[in-house]
Regions:
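Metal-dependent nuclease catalytic cores that hydrolyze phosphodiester bonds in DNA/RNA
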Residues: 1-128
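Short cysteine clusters
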Residues: 18, 219-222
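Mg2+/Mn2+-dependent nuclease catalytic core
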Residues: 37, 95-205
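Phosphate/oxyanion-binding loops and surfaces in catalytic or ligand/nucleic-acid-binding neighborhoods
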Residues: 48-52, 159, 202, 225
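Short, well-structured alpha-helical interface segments that form or flank functional binding sites
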Residues: 115, 147, 214-217, 231
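Short strand-connecting beta-turns/loops that link adjacent beta-strands
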Residues: 125-127, 224, 233
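Immediate flanking context of iron-sulfur cluster ligation sites
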Residues: 205-218
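Single conserved hydrophobic/aromatic residue that forms the stacking wall/gate
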Residues: 226-238
Length: 238
């Protein structure tokens, strides 16, 4: 299995709100769940469908997917078609936009040892597109002010900003089981201001296991809550 970052993009909503939770959760093993495996399977299928649509080499994964079904097939096809529409949009700005699928993105300039994997990154002259697939249907996810997406964007800027002179970042979340496509655009300078200010400050606290504990909605995703009583857990997240 691949190494997971202490301060990952996917857990950033939690550790930005509650910095010491990062080191606290380090003491507990993530046992996973059926929902997590469904998401993993869906991402594998999305990757395959998108590569096939773009004419890239790929291998049909369905026989190895534990939770593959007709709904997942429809979701993955819809995702691939949506990303293709963004590629066509990018071609209006750049003849040959770069499309990266399941790309490792390093944002350690701002977050110690920080990295993550972007579902799809599209780079065109002036504009960076970050696309994230969400298979869950419990909570509708917004791209606006979404720290996971913003961290992915920072990682992509590290790779391509000097080549493509990017000035705008467009972030899109595709969440078909909630019929949700959320898109948010921000200026690169605005993103960098956040990275050099709030993000860097909170990341330093989180990496050191310092800062104030802060209860809230983010507690739902805290591994340490597995080991406390149900009444206390409900009290924290209410």
């Amino acid at each position: 299995m691949g190494r997971h970052a202490l301060l990952s993009a996917s857990s950033s909503h939690r550790w930005l709100a509650c910095p010491p939770s990062a080191r606290l959760c380090e003491n507990y093993e993530d046992m996973g769940s059926e929902y997590a495996q469904q998401g993993t399977d869906a991402h594998s299928l999305c990757e395959h469908k998108l590569k096939a649509l773009l004419g890239m080499e790929t291998k049909e994964p369905t026989e190895e997917l534990e939770f593959y079904d007709e709904e997942m097939e429809e979701c993955a096809c819809g995702y691939a078609e949506y990303v293709l529409s963004l590629v066509e949009e990018a071609k209006k700005e750049c003849k040959d936009p770069v499309v990266l699928i399941e790309q490792r993105l390093d944002f350690s300039r701002y977050v110690e040892e920080g990295f993550g994997t972007g579902d799809c990154v599209i780079i065109a002259d002036g504009t960076l597109y970050i696309v994230d697939y969400k298979h869950g249907k419990g909570v509708e996810v917004s791209a606006e002010g979404n720290p996971q997406m913003m961290l992915y964007a920072l990682g992509a800027l590290e790779l391509f900003d000097g080549i493509y002179d990017i000035d705008t970042v467009r972030m899109a979340i595709y969440q078909p089981r909630r019929e949700n496509v959320s898109v948010y655009a921000m200026a690169k300078d605005e993103l960098l201001k956040w990275a050099e200010g709030e993000l860097s400050e909170k990341a330093k606290l989180a990496y050191a296991g310092e800062g104030e504990f802060c209860a809230g909605e983010h507690c739902k995703f805290c591994l340490s809550l597995i080991h406390i009583s149900e009444p206390t857990r409900l009290q924290l997240i209410s």
